[in-house]
Amino acid sequence: MNEKIKLVEAAQMRADIPEIHPGDTLKVHVKVVEGDKERLQLFQGILISIRGVGMSKTITVRKISHGVGVERIIPLHSPIIEKIEVVKRGKVRRAKLFYMRNRTGKAAMKIKEKTTNSEMA
C-alpha cells in the first residue's frame, strides 16, 4: 500500500479497541441518531468473525433476540462505535464461527469459557 495512504489511515484508526477473538461475548455501544437526538444502543452477542485489515477491519456479532438470530457487521474503526467491552472470553477452535447460525435454542449461544492463569491461582 502507498505510504501516504498508510499515514492517513494510521491517523484515523482507534487505539481504544480491546483485544478480541472469535468466541468472545462482546458489548458494543453504538451511537444511533434519530432526528436531532443521539443516543447509545447496546448490542451484546458472540463475535463470530473478524475480517479485513487496517481501517477496513470489520467484526460480525451475533445474538438471539426473541428467538430470532440477529447479526450485525460493525466496522471496528467507525466513529459510530462508542466503546467495545469484552464480557467473557470464549474458547473455540475456529476463526469463523458460522456454524453457530445453524444452532437453535440454548445451543445457539453456548461457547466454552476460556480460563486464564489469574483464575487458576
UniProtKB/Swiss-Prot annotation:
GO terms for cellular component: cytosolic large ribosomal subunit. Transmembrane segments: none annotated. Gene3D superfamilies: 2.30.30.790. GO terms for biological process: translation. PANTHER family: LARGE RIBOSOMAL SUBUNIT PROTEIN BL19M, RIBOSOMAL PROTEIN L19. This protein is located at the 30S-50S ribosomal subunit interface and may play a role in the structure and function of the aminoacyl-tRNA binding site. This is Large ribosomal subunit protein bL19. It comes from Chloroherpeton thalassium (strain ATCC 35110 / GB-78).
